Amino acid sequence: MQLVHGGDWAGYRAEFGRDALDFSANVSPLGLPEGVARAITAALPTADRYPDPLCRELRAKLALHEGVPTEQILCGNGAADLIFRLVWARKPRRALVTAPTFAEYATALESVGCTVERFFLREQEDFAVTDAFCAAIRPGVDMVFLCQPNNPTGQLTALPLMEQILHRCAACGTLLVVDECFLDFLPDHALHTAKGLLGEGNLVILKAFTKLYGMAGVRLGYALSADTALLEQMQACGQPWGVSSLAQAAGLAALEETAYVEKVRALIAEQRPRLTAGLRALGLRVLDGRANYLLFQASETLGEALRQRGAVLRSCANYPGLGPGWYRTAVRTGPENEQLLKLLAEVLE
């Protein structure tokens, strides 16, 4: 079985018998917040009961956090679970995604026999989404996926352009799905979210606790949409107890971790330009992304050479629109980033 995502720490341990310095997964470098860990431990006595299938308490708290009605929220077993539920609920015949972007959109779409069209972003424009994307949206395209910021490029789509894309989708009878799982790492995230457009009706926003709160192993995400009938269909399309009681407890605790979130945002804002400068000083081409990860170009053999030295990047060779020699690295703590740069310097000598 071949895995196509980063974060395969278990595979590395099985191969090398040790843990790696993992830059392949874009999660908080500060780890699980202490308050969340305590909440999971405190919830263990409830593990003998079925979890609330509707996540009532968590959705109520998310409604206050996001400023949307409770009925416009659906929780799932990570954002990936919600992507599949959405596709299974709608069963689109034709869909549009950018290239490069997160692979699970196409994987989910193809699981229902959907024809996936790729809009190839231009390398000379640093893979930015431009208004040319609107022209690719036409009647017969049932669903459009946009990642904000895009994974793996880190590029943001300007909110006025996002609104233009949404209106084009509405005119064509198309559902727009905006993946904001990495957006909350930005201090100015409120300036880039599509939440203010939810009233349009043909919009679904995907979010996750996974990345910002370092909860990848807990699995917890949620969808926002004014189309409550669609959310009910998504609820019915998966297993009835999709979010464990421990994950619900973790989510409730995470929403109290405001100081932790500010610390993570400050760390990424400080370290991203430093890591960018360090990579460029080694002669590597680095995109000016805004996310908690960076896309850069190097030799095709770089990734494996680093693996042998105990550090793992996300090879982007399997991303349509990229190819061999493209890599994504997470932005981690200062000492970890310095260790990566040191290992890179050794490999590039």
Label each region the model flagged.
Residues 88-146:
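PLP-dependent aminotransferase-like
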Residues 110, 127-140, 152-176, 180-212:
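Active-site pre-lysine segment of PLP-dependent enzymes
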Residues 118-120, 143-150, 176-180, 287-288:
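Short beta-strands and strand-loop turn motifs
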